[in-house]
UniProtKB/Swiss-Prot annotation:
GO terms for biological process: DNA recombination; provirus excision. The keyword DNA-binding applies. Gene3D superfamilies: 1.10.1660.20. It holds the Pfam family Exc. The keyword DNA-binding applies. Keywords: DNA recombination, DNA-binding, Viral genome excision. The gene is xis. This is Excisionase.
Length: 78
């Protein structure tokens, strides 16, 4: 049995009937809101069977005069 499963299957196990939509799950994956985080395999997001949802742990604090390129990178979540 594989350790990685799709986000939708993981959400059914983690949240039950109240699982978020596929779009929201992808946002969670891009924001690394699971521990261990989801990874993109080809066109699909996959996640470890034992991962847990942790949400946003901390927001980076940027100075007001930060470089616009830095602000854009942080805003995109990359």
């Amino acid at each position: 049995m594989s350790r990685l499963i799709t986000l939708q299957d993981w959400a059914k196990e983690e949240f039950g009937d109240l699982a978020p939509s596929e779009r929201v799950l992808k946002k969670y994956a891009q924001g690394k809101m699971m521990a261990p985080p989801a990874i993109k395999v080809g066109r699909y997001w996959m996640i470890d069977r034992n991962s847990r949802f942790v949400g946003t742990l901390a927001e980076p604090q940027l100075p007001i005069n930060a470089n616009p390129k830095l602000q854009r990178i942080i805003a995109d979540g990359c």
